Amino acid sequence: MVNYTVKNWQGEEAGTGTLELKTAKPETAKHLIHRVVVSHLAAARQGNASSKTRSEVRGGGRKPWRQKGTGRARAGSIRSPLWRGGGVIFGPKPRDFEVKVNRKEKRLALRTALISQADNFIVVESFAEQFSQPKTKELTAALSRWGASPEEKILLILTEIPENVYLSGRNICNLKIIRADSLNVYDVILADRVIATAAALAKIEEVYGA
């Protein structure tokens, strides 16, 4: 269980709350999070790297010279992997890098990652109504008022991402905005500071709660 203070748009205390999520045992937490992160990064790979073997390279069907009598090393094809322009031995072929992790494990890892970031958590009130139009300067100033440094990697968790908020934040290089129901372990543990609205935390408990 994590107790937190809710801040308003001006950065002043506006309330308190608690976040209750079931986490992994300390002795297995690190291994579990590692597995889920590996799975997440593997799933992001395109896996379409492809090279040609000697049988796929154009040409090379004719024997370059006769087997015996020339004094040269025997050769059967100009596309041998030993030759320039030849095929590739054990080169990459299109493949699926998926590492299967059970959904229960993913959710447990995510809850554990969130609780592990408790010291870096900032909870704020919903602020979508503050952006009648995109304004990067306003969002940057708000992040500073809430206690986040511009040099920190910031993960901003919202229930919904209004267009004006998205447009205001997309040019802030260290900021990533994500929906509460689309969280992943990698983004959570990569962040130096996790900022979430109180409504987003309620959504997290609803979606990922044990």
UniProtKB/Swiss-Prot annotation:
Name its GO BP terms in alphabetical order: translation
Can you quote a single GO CC term?
ribosome
Q: Does the keyword Lipoprotein apply?
A: no
According to the UniProt entry, the coiled-coil residues are: none
- Which Pfam families has this protein been placed in? Ribosomal_L4
State any single GO MF term: rRNA binding
Question: Briefly, what is this protein's role?
Answer: One of the primary rRNA binding proteins, this protein initially binds near the 5'-end of the 23S rRNA. It is important during the early stages of 50S assembly. It makes multiple contacts with different domains of the 23S rRNA in the assembled 50S subunit and ribosome. Forms part of the polypeptide exit tunnel.
Quaternary structure annotation from Swiss-Prot or TrEMBL: Part of the 50S ribosomal subunit.
- Family stated for the protein in its record: Belongs to the universal ribosomal protein uL4 family.
This chain's protein is named Large ribosomal subunit protein uL4
In which organism is this protein found?
Microcystis aeruginosa (strain NIES-843 / IAM M-2473)
Task: Report which gene this protein is encoded by.
Answer: rplD
